[in-house]
């Protein structure tokens, strides 16, 4: 079973590392090509393109300028420990054991606008480049055209390496659009998390992101191999709803959260 998740905008390069083990990202030739384009952007260009504040634009212009083709423990850290959004709160990688990290390295992949596809222990220099960014580049008008079939081919290689053909899509629509499902050698399953709010069940972004991380961790902790085992996911009050689920989309619901 292979899990795919989105990256996070929030990064952490300060907390103590839960492991010293690391690998190097595999698509850095592509990243370097993108970085040439990014380095031509002024802070004003970045603010407009990414729809961010002047402060964040300045920070990311500096990150682009400082980015190096050589990755070391001085200028980078493992991707799974560098990302710090809602998904990664649910995943809680800082509590993993060395055995967990080894398992995760084989069974989890992170999509990325700059790095394409990251393994958990791949060193990552800080950046912000969301997959939906309309960044014109030598391969097209946006990052989907830039990455083309590269990410899908990498996912197929990872699927073959880890031993079965089940791909669990815990990424956002923005990021999963970088994957070509028809070219995947996989049974693709997309879990959907619905929370009750005022009597209605709907996807609430904050809760759904955290739930994606919790499901990834559930798969890792329990070394889950089968689709039926995945349906047993019951963390934080979620439960599988067979009547609303299909072969490709698993619906999980949760009752209203009391604050």
Swiss-Prot record:
**Pfam families reported in the protein's UniProt record:** H2O2_YaaD
Transmembrane parts of this sequence? none
Top-level taxon = Bacteria
An example Gene Ontology CC term for this record: cytosol
Q: Which GO terms describe its biological process?
A: response to hydroperoxide
Recorded hits in PANTHER family, A to Z, give: PEROXIDE STRESS RESISTANCE PROTEIN YAAA, PEROXIDE STRESS RESPONSE PROTEIN YAAA
Family the entry assigns: Belongs to the UPF0246 family.
From the Swiss-Prot or TrEMBL record, give the protein name. UPF0246 protein PBPRA0561
């Amino acid at each position: 079973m292979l899990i795919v998740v989105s990256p996070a905008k929030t990064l952490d390069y300060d907390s103590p590392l839960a492991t010293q083990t690391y690998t190097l990202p595999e698509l850095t030739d592509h990243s370097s090509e993108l970085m040439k384009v990014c380095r031509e952007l002024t802070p004003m260009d970045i603010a407009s393109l990414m729809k961010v504040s002047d402060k964040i634009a300045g920070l990311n212009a500096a990150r682009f300028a400082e980015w190096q083709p050589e990755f070391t423990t001085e200028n980078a850290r493992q991707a799974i420990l560098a990302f710090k959004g809602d998904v990664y709160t649910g995943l809680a990688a800082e509590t993993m054991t060395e055995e967990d990290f080894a398992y995760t390295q084989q069974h989890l992949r992170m999509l990325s606008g700059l790095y394409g596809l990251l393994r958990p222990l791949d060193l990552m220099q800080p950046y912000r480049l969301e997959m939906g960014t309309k960044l014109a580049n030598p391969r097209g008008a946006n990052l989907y055209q830039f990455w083309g079939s590269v990410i899908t081919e990498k996912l197929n290689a990872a699927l073959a390496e880890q031993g079965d053909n089940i791909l669990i899509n815990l990424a956002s629509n923005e990021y999963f659009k970088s994957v070509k499902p028809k070219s995947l050698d996989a049974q693709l399953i997309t879990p959907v998390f619905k929370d009750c709010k005022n009597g209605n069940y709907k996807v609430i972004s904050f809760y759904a992101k955290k739930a994606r991380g919790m499901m990834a961790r559930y798969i890792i902790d329990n070394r889950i191999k089968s689709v039926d085992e995945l349906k047993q996911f019951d963390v934080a009050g979620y439960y599988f709803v067979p009547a609303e689920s299909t072969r490709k989309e698993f619906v999980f619901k949760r009752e209203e959260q009391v604050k």
